[in-house]
């Protein structure tokens, strides 16, 4: 609560200082006080702070780049985009929900999603959506800065959870376990809805990434990647040499008519 009050106050003070400095530089100190520019400075700073915080809160609610896309009409017409898509699922969530109860399980999920947000952002990922106990992460191919990002983000998330071991054990009596599937392909991105508008992603790559993630449990793996995604990442000079790739060959995914080559990735 204190931080919610202090941060806007500091922002207002900083903007007021900069704005006052500009006025004094242009008009002189005497004119600044004489013509009551102090009130204008504070009022302008307050308005600017409110607008900046409002934008930040809405962007946090909608997701990175989504608000900008809606404001500028980037996706007013659906467009094709090449993206890496990861479905990351919390393992054993049904048992955890029964053990913790609805409210505490919600807090458990929220803690987990908050903890993994930073490594996702650090690796250039966009959190597209939370679906129950699952998070969908995407990288635009042209903005996926490093070949490390769609692969090593999984292991950085694991490191974050390990470091929070004591916290999760003390509060919930269990540690989050998770599995992920990564795929690459063309999605269709466009605005969807009227009363509640969002930028929606659709296409075969979304369904396939979800099916790859489902294969993790069947194959006793924690991270499976399609060879389509691996081959695209291997084209880059900075492909991480530290990862261990174990091929599972071509497999039949549930609900898919054609087979797909997948591999497990480990460090």
Segments predicted by a language model, with ranges:
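Hydrophobic transmembrane alpha-helices
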Residues: 1-34
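Regulatory cytosolic signal-relay segments
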Residues: 21-81
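Catalytic NTP-binding/metal-coordinating core of nucleotidyl cyclase/transferase enzymes
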Residues: 77-152
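Alpha-helix/helix-capping structural signal
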Residues: 91, 186-187, 228
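Short glycine-enriched, charge-decorated loop/helix-capping segments at active-site entrances
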Residues: 100-103, 195-199
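Alpha-helical scaffold within the catalytic cores of cyclic-nucleotide enzymes
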Residues: 110-124, 141-180, 184, 204-213, ...
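Acidic/histidine metal-binding catalytic segments
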Residues: 131, 170-179, 222-229
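Cytosolic regulatory/linker segments at or just downstream of nucleotide-handling modules
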Residues: 218-267
